[in-house]
Amino acid sequence: SFYATGLTDEKMRGQLRGFQASLNEYGDEDKSIPKDWFDAFTRLRKLLEGDKVDREPVNNKTVILLDELPWMDTAKSDFKSALDYFWNSWASAQEDLVLIACGSATSWIITNLLTDKKGFHNRVTRRIHLAPFSLAECEKLFEFNDIVMPRNQMIESYMVFGGIPHYLNLLDQRLSLAQNINELCFKEYGYLHNEYYNLFHSLYDK
């Protein structure tokens, strides 16, 4: 399978440089930066037509995972047009190919993929909505991580971390909930110290 991710606050050339690095990682021997997104997807097609990209062992399909896809679509980059052309001219006809598009900017995904009237119209086969864990699921996660916590503190942790498994996995079983919150959120070098500002900026570009 092939994985590439968009880069925050990078213009077109920076995005293409990142995509080129992914192409090289999966076996593309061309070390030059693609001149545009049409060139980038042409190189991806050639790579996938070869035998360097492994198939998924479960279903024998080739998966293209484009993470933070909206960040790739910078101003005047023609990214969406190139993606449309790649998908409609070749990729959609490959029965063993799956394209997974991810992005924190959900408005872009909705406008350009889910409700698109052009290139991706009626092309989406499945929408994956990743909901936060319920309180019961959080309790199971705590048990799995050997974290002993009374239920009132589980509720408090849910109010702070919102049932997001990635955040809950950061909790240190040796510390109380209050100590964990202090270490993660309020210490200068805490893992989540700047998380609010990072999320706000990525969602609203402010």
Where are these regions (language model features)?
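Phosphate-binding site recognition
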Residues: S1-K206
